[in-house]
Amino acid sequence: MHLLVLGANGLLGSNAVQAGLEKGWTVSGTYHSTAPDFDIPLFELDIIDSSTTSEIIEAVDPDWVVNCAAMTDVDGCEEHPDRAHDVNAQAPGEIAAYCNQAECEFLHVSTDYVFDGKSTASYSENDSVNPVQVYGQSKLDGERAVQEVMPEALVTRLSFVYGVHRGTDELAGFPKWVRDQLVADNEVPLFTDQHITPSRAGHTASTLLELIEAGASGTYNVACRSCVSPYEFGAAICDRMGAAKSLLEDGSQSDIERPATRPAHTCLDVTKTEDKLGRRQPTLTADLEAISGWFDSEPKPNDR
């Protein structure tokens, strides 16, 4: 199996590279500006550069292209909607078309923010979509662009990605911020009126490759089984660190002004993924246990 990971220097992309290498697959990757520290063929690429993208796919001749490249800054997308559309919507459709021409398969990574968050139940792949900000709309447009030219493509929706960056071996995302605040003895304001199903990058990347091996196509939710608020997520990190929860402060999304609206409840139902793979997705507690070494003063590099 030959995998081409677009966005190999991102959190998810670096884990996809690592997961592929651990399976003994041939892996190539692209990066936007800074090359990751992997001993694989790497190509500098801005995915809105359609001609270069096409040339790389033709040169690499992969079995699968995995698109982890995206504009994920939610507020940045709101402030720069044209760039968000180019990266998150137009480019994925073009990549899918190139994959058709090259006769390779395509996995596109999307988001829980395609939903409006008005439901109190976890969203399945078949629930109605209704993004409430530019980021979610651009990602939904990307899903549709991909599926229009390649109906058999694999589209995966993730939620609140965090974990260990495999190019730098450093903790990244929400847990890093909470950990650093707790270590500095700072108060940590966390929302209680937002609910998500966090996606640990390491397990998520492995799940994406399992779906590839299982011959999956269509849309799949890939997240943990725990629907939690950021406050509850922070409390779980405190438990993992053995830190006092007294530093955590109840907060509301209305407490701060941001350019983009965030949906209140975008927990993902992962039943379809579990049924396809014949196993359960992890809980948040299990996912944090898997990277417990990065909450210590001296990380354990072999933790996954």
Where does each model-flagged region fall?
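Active-site Tyr-X1-5-Lys
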Residues: 130-154
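Mid/C-terminal beta-alpha module of Rossmann-like enzyme folds, strongest
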Residues: 184, 191, 207-208, 214-259, ...
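Amphipathic terminal alpha-helices
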Residues: 284-304
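NAD(P)-dependent short-chain dehydrogenase/reductase
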Residues: 147-195, 203
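Conserved Rossmann-fold NAD(P)-dependent oxidoreductase catalytic core, especially the SDR/UDP-sugar
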Residues: 90-134
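NAD(P)H-binding glycine-rich loop region in Rossmannoid oxidoreductase-like domains
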Residues: 44-87
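N-terminal Rossmann NAD(P)H-binding glycine-rich loop of SDR-like oxidoreductase domains
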Residues: 1-23
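Glycine-rich NAD(P)-binding loop of the Rossmann-fold in SDR/ketoreductase-type enzymes
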Residues: 48, 79, 83-94, 129, ...
